[in-house]
């Protein structure tokens, strides 16, 4: 058996691959052994005595199928879990995510003049104090707050109107009483 170490090394550098990927024709080993330069190796490649093997395909089809199943919720039971709940999904990350969502909503509402700066501050502190579980709860709280504000404004305006009416009627009554007193005198 002829040693083809040199030829393998040259062929690997010419074909830009590893020596394991080379295929040297076993029937023409004597002719291959005569090649001692890159040019002669190129000629052998052209003749088909030296070839570069195709890479072995490493299929990901099974991995894709497994991932698809995991997305459906398979293979995620208690037996498959290694870390604690906090290690798998840190509560701090969940908290930060929630705060960012709520604060973004509050900023948007303040910019759109849906809430004033005082309400913004009140809701901001409330969200920081874990008062609102999610965005929906916060929006609901804002609506309730606005409804209460409208109701209280309406009540105060009604009270003001009633007060003004009472004052006017009292003044009229006093005026009448003075006129009656003058007539009597």
From Swiss-Prot:
It comes from Tetrahymena thermophila (strain SB210). PANTHER family: 60S RIBOSOMAL PROTEIN L19. InterPro entries: 60S_ribosomal_eL19_sf, Ribosomal_eL19, Ribosomal_eL19_dom, Ribosomal_eL19_dom1, Ribosomal_eL19_euk. Residues 152-185 are annotated as: Disordered. This is Large ribosomal subunit protein eL19. One of its GO terms (biological process) is translation. The keyword Protease does not apply. SUPFAM superfamilies: Ribosomal protein L19 (L19e).
